Amino acid sequence: MRLENKRTIITGAGPGIGRAIAERFCVEGANVMVAEIETQGGEETVKRILKSGGTAIFQQTDTSKEDSIQCMVECMVSEFGGIDIVVNNAAAFVFGSIEETGPEEWAKVLSVNVIGYANTIKSALTFLKKSKNAAIVNIASVSSFIAQPEFLPYNTSKGAVSQMTRCLAMDLAKYNIRVNAVCPGAIYTRASEQHMDFMGLDHEKGRELFGQDALLKRMGRPDEIANGVLFLASEEASFITGEHLVIDGGATLD
């Protein structure tokens, strides 16, 4: 098993990409904390994992709040004795133009997508330092490095995740902690359905539209992102840090 007994926190592990990561990690032997703000979604992820023979616990967590993150870490250490891997996947999806984006919208997207990522790593760092081969994987986005109309708040936050990943790779290398990012393209999830709703598209037309930019002419699946995250978290990527793995079907190749 590629992650046997690896003690892993995955934030935003309700439906979608986070759930796919949690399930994939458990198949590979990881002991996973499903950290999710929505209790129903998080508990469903754990239920699915336990049913398939994996090891997972649920912790209701609001990553926009530092005390909630600290509670998450304390619970993780109490249950599993330490932390080997952190996957930052929790996300706030806030779209709009500069005129439409006010202080509340900025606070929401930055508190989860940027500050929440940083606080999760900071809170887990003492335990990651004690791990022999610790890894951090931040879920960024192709929106980290491309411009999109009326995506200002979201793209700004994901651009920050990209720089956070690079800077932390430099700062944490002395502790043998690797830090990488995965940049998904158009992936069919509940979040993508919400974006289709924002654009006034029905979901069938939305899938066709969102998939047309990919060279493979379709949207991706959450499990395809999970496979990339698994690679970066595993010993197979032991000499990789500060990198961004783009998984978008070739949509941003140019």
Q: What positions do the PLM features span?
A:
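Short C-terminal tail/terminal secondary-structure segment
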Residues: 146, 229-230, 241-254
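Conserved glycine-rich cofactor-binding loop
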Residues: 7, 14-15
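Active-site loop-to-helix junction immediately N-terminal to the catalytic Tyr of the SDR YXXXK motif
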Residues: 101, 147-156, 167, 195
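Short, small/polar-rich loop/turn modules that mediate ligand/substrate recognition or access, typified
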Residues: 173, 178, 240-242
